[in-house]
Amino acid sequence: MDKQQSRVLNLLFQGSLVKQILAGLIAGILLAWLAPEVAKMMSLLGNLFISALKAVAPVLVWVLVMASIANHRQGQKTSIRPILVLYLLATFFAALTAVVASFVFPSVLTLVVNDSQLSPPENIAEVLKGVLINVVANPVDALINGNYMGILAWAIGLGLALRHASDTTKALTQDFADAVTNLVRVVIRLAPIGIFGLVSSTIATTGFKALAGYLHVLLVLIGCMLFVALVVNPLIVFWKIRRNPYPLVWACLRESGVTAFFTRSSAANIPVNMAMCRRMNLNEDTYSVSIPLGATINMGGAAITITILTLAAVNTLGMPVDIPTALLLSLVAAICACGASGVAGGSLLLIPLACSMFGISNDLAMQVVAVGVMIGVLQDSAETALNSSTDVLFTATVCIAEDERLVANPLTEKNNG
């Protein structure tokens, strides 16, 4: 009996995580098909997994950033600036791609009444104001509410202050970071069980029937995100590292994108991305900052959602859109997307802001938001998968470009276990 339990534990904690997630996905679909009532009860497993990730992620970011900065040695290289440039470029190109897709495949919405009481920001300045307020938030509130801008600000500040501390204190911060990292590894190994619960309960509850009426706009959204993930981002990676980008792209989509697709939370996927960077032997001083930063501002998927749904509303109302206005919308969508993580409801609640460019009333814009909510089962999942996998993709890209030794031993060649 003990041997059987030991085998199960070894399989769960030492087997291939990707294969286990795939098994959980298939099992979830089968359960939802064969026993939908039982599948609905499995939502507890998914909710527990997401709650566990959201619980450990803020603490993980805090201690890793603080420890890496506190223990940073003079002359030790980090690569945050080029990663930040890639984040912003990719978000703008994603919005631009969405504009082109909207012109080539115009969508028409059947606008519905939305009864929800929503409070979207009125202009871009309000979005930026919200981000700045988050930066100076109370540190305890930032940890409790998962405010990663505030967490980053306090972690960076304390890390800089602790640079002047004794070696013993610095070692303590590193030991604490290692302890939290080990705890996170245990949570990540439970991903197959969590995804099994999420998939089975979601399919059993919705059956994807709500998606049928909005299939066209959904296909444009998903197609655009796939194009960015498989064409635009690889081109950016190739420009940076001057070699075949697809082994790295596929590894990031497989390791990070699949998990993010089902958790539907960039914040919850931070530990997954951190673990992937660690397995790739990337610079911890770099990825401990770039991954949580990416979860906050690298929002290509959000830029696509804002752009396509806004232009769908414009097309529905028969408004003409010229190229300069479309380019301006791309820029606005990119800026709005960078603030999406600081707005309750994310990218959908920023659609009225983009709609205001075209003089669309708030009432009509909210009906577009309602459409987004209806297709959110797939839209939000695909958006999060693109956003989160791109975080680790660009972090790895810059690290590889600046350290050729990483090319000889990438994750794509050591992904058997």
Swiss-Prot record:
Subcellular location: Cell inner membrane
UniProt entry keywords in alphabetical sequence: Amino-acid transport, Cell inner membrane, Cell membrane, Membrane, Symport, Transmembrane, Transmembrane helix, Transport
Catalytic activity from the UniProt record: L-serine(in) + Na(+)(in) = L-serine(out) + Na(+)(out); L-threonine(in) + Na(+)(in) = L-threonine(out) + Na(+)(out)
GO terms for MF: neutral L-amino acid:sodium symporter activity
Gene Ontology biological process terms from the UniProt entry: serine transport; threonine transport
Pfam families in the cross-refs: SDF
GO cellular component, one term: plasma membrane
Membrane topology: Multi-pass membrane protein
InterPro entries given in the database record: Na-dicarboxylate_symporter, Na:dicarbo_symporter_sf, Ser_Thr_transp_SstT
TM region(s), chain numbering: 21-41, 49-69, 83-103, 142-162, 193-213, 218-238, 291-311, 331-351
Domain of life: Bacteria
Function in brief: Involved in the import of serine and threonine into the cell, with the concomitant import of sodium (symport system).
Family: Belongs to the dicarboxylate/amino acid:cation symporter (DAACS) (TC 2.A.23) family.
HAMAP family per the UniProt record, alphabetical: Ser_Thr_transp_SstT
Descriptive protein name: Serine/threonine transporter SstT
